[in-house]
């Protein structure tokens, strides 16, 4: 059995973070994919693409430990209607601003989000779902260490510590 429904896959840019200038940036919103996802999915049909990568947006769905998966549900409903398999990226550069990046809570809170998301999505899938816990761990670590993705406390110049924290979060069960 193939893991993916189609060889070719689409990806909708879902980076979601606070810029170094302190401005929230959701690429899902900036590209209007957050409101055009059904149209975007239908546009894939002539190309025989039935697999897409989407981002959950940890910063957007996390309400201090409870979650608003409204957007996730809407995209899943549209994906089902259009025969699309979604592979979810859970953290795409961004995380809640009120979270100390280097604390153990970062790891446990991310694990809680992952578990809650998997439980929420379970009824939507007939086949095993595909998840990417943290998008591009090396690039994310570099971006934090260079100050592109600000953290509290600052992670500038601490690329090894940053990467270790991201790996701890991604592998926590």
Where are these regions (language model features)?
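Catalytic domains of carbohydrate-active enzymes, especially glycoside hydrolases
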Residues: 30-57, 78
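Short glycine-enriched, charge-decorated loop/helix-capping segments at active-site entrances
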Residues: 24-30, 100-105
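Glycan-recognition patch characteristic of GH18 chitinases/ENGases
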Residues: 9-11, 17, 30-32, 51, ...
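Active-site-proximal loop/turn and secondary-structure-junction residues that shape catalytic pockets
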Residues: 14-16, 58-60, 92-94, 137-138
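Glycine-rich, proline-tolerant flexible connector loops at the mouths of alpha/beta enzymes
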Residues: 56-67
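N-terminal small/glycine-rich loop or linker at the start of catalytic domains
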Residues: 1-29
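Active-site region of glycoside hydrolase catalytic domains
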Residues: 2-9, 77, 81-173
């Amino acid at each position: 059995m193939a893991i993916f429904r189609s060889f070719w896959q689409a990806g909708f840019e879902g980076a979601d973070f606070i810029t170094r200038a302190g401005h929230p940036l959701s690429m899902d919103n900036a590209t209007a994919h957050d409101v055009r996802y059904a149209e975007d999915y239908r546009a894939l049909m002539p190309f025989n693409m039935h697999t897409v990568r989407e981002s959950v947006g940890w910063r957007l769905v996390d309400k201090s430990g409870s979650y608003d998966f409204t957007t996730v549900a809407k995209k899943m409903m549209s994906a089902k209607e259009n025969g699309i398999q979604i592979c979810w990226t859970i953290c795409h550069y961004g995380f809640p601003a009120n979270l100390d990046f280097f604390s153990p809570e970062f790891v446990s809170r991310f694990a809680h989000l992952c578990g809650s998301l998997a439980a929420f999505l379970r009824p939507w899938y007939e086949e095993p779902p595909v998840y990417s816990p943290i998008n591009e761990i090396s690039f994310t670590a570099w971006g934090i260490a260079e100050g592109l993705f600000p953290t509290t406390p600052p992670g500038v110049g601490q690329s090894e510590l940053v990467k270790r924290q991201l790996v701890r979060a991604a592998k926590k069960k």
